[in-house]
């Protein structure tokens, strides 16, 4: 059963004018998809909103609580009683080192990606992290484990985390903004986005640009409405396949996300036009399945593929 922690204030609902971003956040939580949010310069409410991701995250199951408490204990940390059922939400500073992110040290302690196990790792202003730190995320995002070695001793820690990143669209932050003028050169934009690399971005199923025209989402959602959609979507996924959509492996995607000719045609056409990778092709299918689950729809048709493509925005620099 999908349950949420009680919320005693309405600060989430008070951040108006962010209906599209709120929906994108709920979509990410519903299917446990990794998400990249491209921010709008000067709109500080977006920074406040992404810090409220925990309000959308369901409680930990008892089994999940055991593994989380065990990892935190290895790090010499203790989760207080009122935190036991809450999903970990880690947001390290941009100066975080590889050791701090992935773990290490004399006694091989877990790092941020393991402390975020069964929860979320939020990298705000991700472009300000070291390139080496960002690239280290690729393997644990795939394997859900991290293996550390020191002095001939190897230790593995679970790191099944959901990744959320925010970034400006360019060094000056104005690219794509209808109300501002971007002063960046094409070369500076290229250097800016190359910090992420194509392999890392391929592991991000949702790329949401708050500067783009999101007219397909024209509603101001409340926290209770989004929680209801998340609960509905996750319940359906667990009943159908025993896991959330982002966790489906290649052989399960075709089994649980069958596409009719119309939907397949829309997706194939988009792939031919944009040159999306095979991994992003599958990501679109998974996000479309989650969108349908949020709306209580059984089959993924062409319309849901089109909606999912809206959540895979074109980046300022194409790899």
Predicted regions and their residues:
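Dynamic helix-loop-helix/coil hinge segments at AAA+ ATPase domain boundaries and subdomain interfaces
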Residues: 2-22, 59
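Phosphate-binding P-loop
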Residues: 4-5, 17-18, 26-32, 41, ...
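Conserved RecA-like P-loop NTPase ATPase core
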Residues: 25, 50, 65, 101, ...
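Conserved alpha-helical scaffold flanking the Walker A/P-loop in AAA+ ATPase domains
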Residues: 26-28, 83, 88, 99-121
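Walker A/P-loop
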Residues: 30, 35-78
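Conserved P-loop NTPase mechanochemical-coupling segment
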Residues: 60-66, 74-100
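Basic, amphipathic alpha-helical bundle interface domains used for macromolecular binding and assembly
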Residues: 107-108, 131-319
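Conserved Walker B
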Residues: 119, 125-129
